[in-house]
């Protein structure tokens, strides 16, 4: 498990199975397309601490190019519902992830707009929303 401490004091634990998925989609070749999906996890009760336990991977419905990824909503909600039920309501949608074709990825303006949208429409039940760029 990877433990990350963010500058605002938030702690994020990423399970090894999720790290393996992220690594498998890194854009190492010039022809590799961006990939992404949703983040599923839970908040440690009464703490600014999150555990990232599952992610979706690209589907045939997603739009992938070398420099962009647009996730389809078709498969996301059923996956969220399944994880919520399996966890007795503790795990839910925590945010989004995708790759960038650069060694040190930084959020684009599109990425920042996506996070603002998720926060404003309250897509996530948690106080914080995560964006992981691989």
List where the protein language model places each region.
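Conserved beta-strand-loop surface patch within small alpha/beta domains used
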Residues: 1-93, 102-134
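Histidine-centered divalent metal-coordination motifs
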Residues: 98-100
């Amino acid at each position: 498990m990877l433990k990350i401490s963010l500058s605002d004091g938030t702690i994020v634990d990423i399970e090894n199975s999720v790290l393996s998925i992220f690594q498998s989609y890194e854009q190492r070749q010039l022809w590799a397309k961006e990939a992404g999906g949703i983040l599923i996890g839970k908040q440690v009760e009464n703490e600014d601490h999150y555990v990232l336990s599952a992610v979706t991977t690209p589907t045939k419905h997603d739009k992938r190019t070398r420099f962009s990824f647009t996730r389809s909503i078709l498969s996301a909600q059923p996956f969220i519902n399944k994880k919520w039920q399996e966890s007795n309501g503790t795990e839910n949608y925590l945010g989004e992830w995708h790759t960038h074709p650069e060694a040190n990825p930084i959020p684009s303006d599109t990425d920042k707009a996506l996070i603002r949208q998720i926060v404003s429409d309250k897509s996530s039940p948690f106080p914080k929303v995560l964006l992981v760029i691989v």
